[in-house]
A protein has these predicted regions:
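Tandem CBS (Cystathionine beta-synthase) repeat/Bateman regulatory domains
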Residues: 1-176
């Protein structure tokens, strides 16, 4: 059987087995990251870029009055600076004396109307939402749009790997 045929079979099985897959992968609340970097809408863009760089994350939910109002990524913050230096990195951009970020706020550059998830959603539903909207992370919010965490692609991979490890054992080969 070809690798492509196996891949198609896997996708077909996944679609037909969605209720089982939902049960196995669990909920967004079980998979999400709870210790999340949050950026204030009125924070300077320069400070936001420094914070993302320092925390080693590529993006974060944006909050205003305790509610998620957007999402911002390093890319969103770097685009204005690329006009100065197309090869710029966050560290070099922040070291530059004439950064185009000066005077800009997170709210000027963020993606508004963020796609969000809820803790009770199945991970499968959240992944579908990520794919449909072309995003890599979903802020997880309560009914009042207050942040509870974030679900990232890495969180999804961990959920799948956890399921795979549980199903196939620890991954060690006992046949020496």
């Amino acid at each position: 059987m070809s690798a492509r045929h196996q891949e198609v079979m896997t996708v077909t099985v996944a679609v037909h087995e969605q209720p089982t897959l939902e049960r196995l992968l669990g909920t967004v609340g079980e998979a999400m990251t709870r210790d999340v970097v949050l950026l204030a809408a009125d924070m300077s863009a320069e400070m936001a870029l420094r914070r993302l760089d320092h925390k080693a994350v590529s993006g974060a939910p944006v909050i205003d009055r305790g509610r998620v109002v957007g999402v911002i990524t390093q890319r969103d913050l770097l685009v204005p600076t690329l006009l100065d230096d197309p090869a710029g990195s966050p560290a070099l951009v922040l070291a530059g004396p004439r950064s185009r970020l000066i005077g800009l706020r997170v709210s000027d550059l963020m993606s508004e109307e963020p796609v969000t998830a809820e803790v009770h959603w199945p991970v499968v539903r959240a992944v579908r939402s990520m794919i449909d909207h072309g995003v890599n992370r979903l802020p997880v919010v309560d009914q009042a749009s207050r942040p509870l965490g974030v679900l990232t692609r890495d969180d999804v991979v961990r959920a799948v790997a956890g399921h795979s490890r549980d199903r196939h054992g620890s991954g060690t080969n006992s046949e020496d």
